[in-house]
C-alpha cells in the first residue's frame, strides 16, 4: 500500500498538538486524522490545534470525525471530549461548520503569522486508506453529524443508507 502523498503534519509543542491540514480535508484524510488523534489521545494529549491556513476545503466526513472527538462517547461515561481548536479557518470552512450546526463545538483562533513550528509526518506509518476504511469512517462521521443536530438528518439520510449498503457488499477482486 502506498504511503499517503499529502499527509497531515504534526508538531507537539508543550501540551498542544498542532496538526497542519493539507489543502483538502476530505474523506481520505479523515482516516489519517482519526488515527493520529486517537493515538495521541491514548498517549495523554487532549488539546489539538488544526492549522487550516493552507486548507481550502473540508468535507462533511472530515468534519464529522472532528466532531466525534469533541463530544464524549455516550457508551463510555468516563470518556472525555477533546479540546479541538481551528486556526485560520477560511470563510468556506466556517460556512460548512455553520450549515451543519457544529460551529459551536470548536474554539476558533486567528493568527496573522504562519505557524513556524517544525512539523513532521506522524511517527507511525500511515498508508492510503482502503475503500472499507473510508466507508466505515464516512458512515460513522455522518451518523455523528445527524446525532448532533436533527437538521442534518435529511442532508445525510441517503448518504448513510448508501454507506451501510456498501459496507455489506463484499469487495470484488
Locations of regions flagged by a protein language model:
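STAS-typified acidic loop motif
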Residues: 4-35
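Short acidic-hydrophobic, aromatic-tinged amphipathic segments that line or gate anion-handling sites
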Residues: 106-114
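N-terminal intrinsically disordered, low-complexity regulatory tails that precede a folded domain
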Residues: 1-6, 153
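Charged/polar low-complexity intrinsically disordered segments, enriched in acidic residues
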Residues: 117-165, 170
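Switch/connector loops and helix/strand junctions flanking conserved nucleotide-binding motifs
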Residues: 93-96, 115-119
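Short hydrophobic/aromatic-rich motifs at helix boundaries and adjacent loops
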Residues: 7-10, 40-42, 65, 113-115
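Amphipathic alpha-helical interaction surfaces in cytosolic regulatory modules
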Residues: 27-106
Amino acid at each position: 500500500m502506498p504511503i499517503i502523498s499529502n499527509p497531515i503534519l504534526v508538531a507537539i509543542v508543550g501540551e498542544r498538538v498542532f496538526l497542519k491540514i493539507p489543502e483538502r480535508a476530505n474523506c481520505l484524510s479523515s482516516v489519517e486524522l482519526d488515527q493520529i488523534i486517537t493515538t495521541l489521545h491514548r498517549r495523554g494529549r487532549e488539546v489539538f490545534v488544526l492549522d487550516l491556513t493552507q486548507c481550502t476545503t473540508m468535507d462533511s466526513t472530515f468534519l464529522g470525525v472532528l466532531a466525534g472527538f469533541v463530544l464524549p462517547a455516550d457508551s463510555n461515561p468516563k470518556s472525555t471530549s477533546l479540546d479541538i481548536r481551528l486556526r485560520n479557518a477560511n470563510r468556506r470552512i466556517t460556512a460548512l461548520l455553520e450549515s451543519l450546526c457544529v460551529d459551536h463545538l470548536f474554539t476558533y483562533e486567528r493568527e496573522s503569522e504562519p505557524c513556524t513550528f517544525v512539523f513532521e509526518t506522524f511517527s507511525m506509518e500511515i498508508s492510503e486508506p482502503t475503500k472499507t476504511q473510508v466507508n466505515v469512517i464516512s458512515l460513522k462521521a455522518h451518523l455523528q453529524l445527524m446525532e448532533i443536530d436533527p437538521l442534518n438528518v435529511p442532508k445525510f439520510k441517503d448518504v448513510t443508507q448508501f454507506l451501510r449498503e456498501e459496507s455489506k457488499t463484499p469487495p470484488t477482486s
